[in-house]
């Protein structure tokens, strides 16, 4: 049963590099979006207008934290990463139907 030996020199280096590049791009994209979301949250934290309050009905707690915390909305607990409202325009994540 000596046929079960493995020869690691026959691994295709091109496919290995391609897989590493794809993984690196995906991880970098996730990190960039996360950092971008935190930067957007910092810029919109003290800048809440009536328009920002209205955005909470479409995207809950996207930027203006004080208004989200005052609304006693316990139907959707806050988990995961905040999505800035300008990344996904027009996306309706709330359960209510629009007017």
Swiss-Prot record:
Keywords: Glycoprotein, Hydrogen ion transport, Ion channel, Ion transport, Membrane, Signal-anchor, Transmembrane, Transmembrane helix, Transport, Viral ion channel, Virion. GO terms for molecular function: channel activity. The chain crosses the membrane at residues 19-40. It is found in: Virion membrane. GO terms for biological process: proton transmembrane transport. It comes from the Viruses. Residues 41-99 are intravirion. Its main location: virion. Pfam families: NB. Putative viral proton channel. May play a role in virus entry. Belongs to the influenza viruses type B glycoprotein NB family. Dimer. This is Glycoprotein NB. It comes from Influenza B virus (strain B/Victoria/3/1985). The lineage of its organism: Viruses, Riboviria, Orthornavirae, Negarnaviricota, Polyploviricotina.
């Amino acid at each position: 049963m000596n046929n079960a030996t493995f020869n690691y020199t026959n691994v295709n280096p091109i496919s290995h590099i391609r897989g590493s590049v794809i993984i690196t791009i995906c991880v970098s994209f996730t990190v960039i979006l996360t950092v971008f979301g935190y930067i957007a949250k910092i810029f919109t934290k003290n800048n809440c207008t009536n328009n920002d309050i209205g955005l909470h009905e479409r995207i809950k707690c996207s930027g203006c934290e004080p208004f989200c915390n005052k609304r006693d909305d316990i139907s959707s607990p806050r988990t995961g990463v905040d999505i800035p409202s300008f990344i996904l325009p027009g996306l309706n994540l709330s359960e209510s139907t629009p007017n």
